[in-house]
């Protein structure tokens, strides 16, 4: 989808006092690069796992929201943010695609993929005491009562992505997948043609 892409990593010393009080690791995607702030560790397998999980997820944001997004994302106001009802799509479906691509590449087995998705079921149930529509959570995620459920966007969003993918494959005899649907929507809307937030889901 892109002719070049740069991964920028910064590994922080876990002994830093500010990070011990409040661990704040993460990553941010851009059209042709992504930047990572991850804990430094001598555990090679742990480091590989963190990098693989995070880098694949951030790279796959080139699908959503970088190339398919609503007006709220296209014209994002950092001073007075208005969130999109599709945050679950941008983060959750991207998370599903990252798990799926790691399974398809052989980096994880089918059993490991099932375990990963099962953990997302338990994770979303743990974080969400009462049922909330994903569009409602996404739109209101900056409000205090919704902030504590932010992780659900990734966990349950990934489960919804898998559900949509399996349903599309079943109903169309494998002719349409979630990825092919997103590619079709990207042709219709695309990075410079954002959709109305209320029309997609």
Give the residues covered by each predicted segment.
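Surface-exposed patches in mature extracellular/periplasmic domains of secreted proteins
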Residues: 1-7, 105-114, 172-182
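Juxtacatalytic substrate-recognition/specificity segment
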Residues: 1-86
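A glycine-rich phosphate-binding loop feature that marks nucleotide/adenosyl-phosphate handling sites
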Residues: 9-13, 116-120, 182-184
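Generic recognition of stable, solvent-exposed alpha-helical segments in well-folded globular domains
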Residues: 46-58, 85-96, 112, 116, ...
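Generic, well-ordered alpha-helical scaffold segments in large soluble proteins
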Residues: 53-54, 58-62, 66, 96-104, ...
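Acidic/His/Gly-enriched intrinsically disordered linker/tail segments
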Residues: 68-158, 189-193
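Amphipathic alpha-helical substructures
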Residues: 140-201
């Amino acid at each position: 989808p892109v002719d070049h892409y740069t991964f920028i990593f910064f590994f922080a010393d876990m002994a830093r006092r500010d990070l011990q009080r409040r661990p704040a690791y993460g990553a941010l995607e851009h059209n042709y690069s992504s930047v990572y702030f991850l804990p430094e560790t001598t555990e090679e397998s742990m480091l590989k796992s963190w990098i693989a999980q995070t880098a694949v997820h951030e790279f796959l944001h080139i699908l959503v929201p970088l190339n398919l997004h609503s007006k709220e994302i296209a014209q994002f106001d950092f001073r007075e943010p208005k969130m999109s009802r599709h945050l679950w799509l941008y983060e959750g479906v991207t998370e599903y695609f990252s798990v799926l691509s790691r399974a398809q590449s052989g980096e994880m087995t089918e059993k490991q993929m099932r375990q990963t998705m099962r953990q997302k079921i338990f994770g979303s149930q743990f974080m969400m005491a009462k049922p909330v529509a994903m569009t409602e959570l996404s739109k209101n995620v900056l409000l205090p009562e919704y902030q504590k459920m932010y992780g659900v966007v990734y966990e349950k969003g990934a489960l919804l992505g898998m559900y949509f993918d399996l349903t599309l494959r079943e109903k169309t005899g494998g002719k349409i997948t979630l990825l092919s649907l997103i590619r079709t929507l990207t042709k219709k809307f695309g990075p410079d043609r954002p959709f109305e937030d209320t029309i997609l889901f």
